[in-house]
Amino acid sequence: MYIQRWLYSTNAKDIAILYFIFAIFSGVIGSTMSLIIRLELAAPGNQILHGNHQLFNVLVVGHALLMIFFLVMPGLVGGFGNYMLPLLIGASDMSFARLNNISFWLLPPALVCLVASTLIESWAGTGWTIYPPLSGIQAHSSPSVDLGIFAIHLTSISSLLGAINFIATSYNMRTNGMSYSKMPLFVWAIIITAVMLLLSLPVLTAGVTMLLMDRNFNTSFFEVAGGGDPVLYQHLFWFFGHPEVYILIVPGFGIISHIVSTYSKKPVFGEISMVYAMASIAFLGFLVWSHHMYIVGLDADTRAYFTSSTMVIAVPTGIKIFSWLATLYGGSIRLAVPMLYAIAFLFLFTIGGLTGVALANASLDVAFHDTYYVVGHFHYVLSMGAIFSLFAGYYYWSPQILGLYFNERLAQIQFWLIFVGANVIFMPMHFLGLQGMPRRIPDYPDAYAGWNYVSSIGSVIAIISLALFIYIIYDQLINGLTNKIDNKSVVYSKAPDFVESNTIFANNSIKSASIEFLLNSPPAIHSFNTPAVQS
């Protein structure tokens, strides 16, 4: 029975639950790796890795790949996408139900490959970008890097199949009257993410496949001795790598839009503009990849183009930030836990974006490249963008998904812990970068000791917060119905939120701009067997 339900499942909701469990599992491993990294860097000299500098780089690779491919993408796209997208457009399931199943079940073998690569010979200590010649056969002669490449292949296939599924579902399975202009913002976010995945992943797969050939079959795509060029790999990788960071954050944009709207009791300001802004970000994201490569010897005109085109991305991003602020302005704001995360997201994502504008300048980036300033920048965007929106989405939708409620007070404590912890980790990294501390090193001169120690303290705070989050999930599953009594986050309210064209909204006690809260909680195995009508 269990095997039939969970192994052979073709039901989007069950597959989404599997994605969530997988994401939390991977996230715990990835966070543990980051804690080990920070403990090693807490003071100058060797702390806990006994001078094994290869192992340090292996931890960096493991942390990066786990957090990106095995936590954020399965969580935001696979989990929330599979569960909420059909509900938000009034579909009974995803378009290709069995394809959905294989999309998930390609991920555990990928995780096995990645973990196995850390158990073989000298492991893969290449940095998450897997640049040759360090990832070539001379520098890494063991099969570890090959296993890592297989893991990337499997996650890529998984994401591609999922992307095809999302696009087909939102194209074919919208309910009566749900035109594109009436689709909720989260659905738009998932569609735009799926298009980006579809266009960028094949390029990554091509790049790592060439690397595989270089390593095992004596080709010389990236081998200077045979007429190849490592810079080609960097172009292929970053043509995927830059859209990838938008793939990680755009579903978060969608979630934050829903939360800001619901807890301000207002429709999102400029909804169509928000869609255009997301689409512009996605389009421009494909035109800026070489800003990761200012120091490889691009000529001045190329650098000028990539500087200016990167700065242009700040415009649609600014439109989104100010539209969210306009949504909050004059709203009847309720500071439930999801709303706290959304407001923190706005503040911290903006800071991350501002440091990004500094890095966009080719002249400045020559100094900042490969320093901790870059680490601080992208962790502000990912840790306090993507991860905060994961938490926000969990606290917003999990009572609806599970029919069980979390402990509001514990959730507030967890929010403040991770808010403080994440800032204490990543703010000092900017200072270290300005002082010139390089990335991917396990040891450093004494001058950098102070801020590194502060950063490591923040890491411990954040890990405590994550442990508390795991406990909150446990408590939600055990005491979920008791918690319902004093939970403020749930989307119940007595007064009408805002005038709806749809009478069901107007008469229902549950207020949100989208239809998922009109269903039972938890929703039936197949919701919308009778099609809903969007007036």
From Swiss-Prot:
Q: What does the entry give for GO biological process?
A: electron transport coupled proton transport; mitochondrial electron transport, cytochrome c to oxygen
Per the record, the major location class is: mitochondrion
Family assignment from sequence similarity: Belongs to the heme-copper respiratory oxidase family.
Q: Where in the cell is it found?
A: Mitochondrion inner membrane
- Per UniProt, Fe(II)-heme a binds at 63, 379
Q: Which residues form a coiled coil?
A: none
- Chain positions recorded as Cu cation binding sites: 242, 291-292
Q: Which CDD domains match?
A: Cyt_c_Oxidase_I
Q: Which UniProt keywords apply?
A: Calcium, Copper, Electron transport, Heme, Iron, Magnesium, Membrane, Metal-binding, Mitochondrion, Mitochondrion inner membrane, Respiratory chain, Translocase, Transmembrane, Transmembrane helix, Transport
Annotated positions binding heme a3: 377
Sequence intervals crossing the membrane:
17-37, 58-78, 104-124, 147-167, 184-204, 236-256, 268-288, 311-331, 339-359, 373-393, 413-433, 453-473
Assembly and oligomerization: Component of the cytochrome c oxidase (complex IV, CIV), a multisubunit enzyme composed of a catalytic core of 3 subunits and several supernumerary subunits. The complex exists as a monomer or a dimer and forms supercomplexes (SCs) in the inner mitochondrial membrane with ubiquinol-cytochrome c oxidoreductase (cytochrome b-c1 complex, complex III, CIII).
* Purpose: Component of the cytochrome c oxidase, the last enzyme in the mitochondrial electron transport chain which drives oxidative phosphorylation. The respiratory chain contains 3 multisubunit complexes succinate dehydrogenase (complex II, CII), ubiquinol-cytochrome c oxidoreductase (cytochrome b-c1 complex, complex III, CIII) and cytochrome c oxidase (complex IV, CIV), that cooperate to transfer electrons derived from NADH and succinate to molecular oxygen, creating an electrochemical gradient over the inner membrane that drives transmembrane transport and the ATP synthase.
Q: What is its EC number?
A: 7.1.1.9
Sorted alphabetically, the Gene Ontology cellular component annotations on this record are:
mitochondrial inner membrane; respiratory chain complex IV
The record places the cross-link (1'-histidyl-3'-tyrosine (His-Tyr)) at 242-246
Q: Which residues bind Mg(2+)?
A: 369-370
Keyword Membrane appears in the UniProt entry: yes
Q: Which EC main class describes this enzyme? A: translocase
Source organism of the structure? Wickerhamomyces canadensis (Yeast)
User: How, per the record, is the cofactor bound?
Assistant: Binds 2 heme A groups non-covalently per subunit. Binds a copper B center.
The residues that the entry says bind O2 are: 246
Its pathway, per UniProt, is:
Energy metabolism; oxidative phosphorylation
Recall the GO molecular function terms of this protein's record: cytochrome-c oxidase activity; heme binding; metal ion binding
Q: How does it sit in the membrane?
A: Multi-pass membrane protein
Protein name, please? Cytochrome c oxidase subunit 1
- Residues binding Ca(2+) are 40, 43, 45, 442
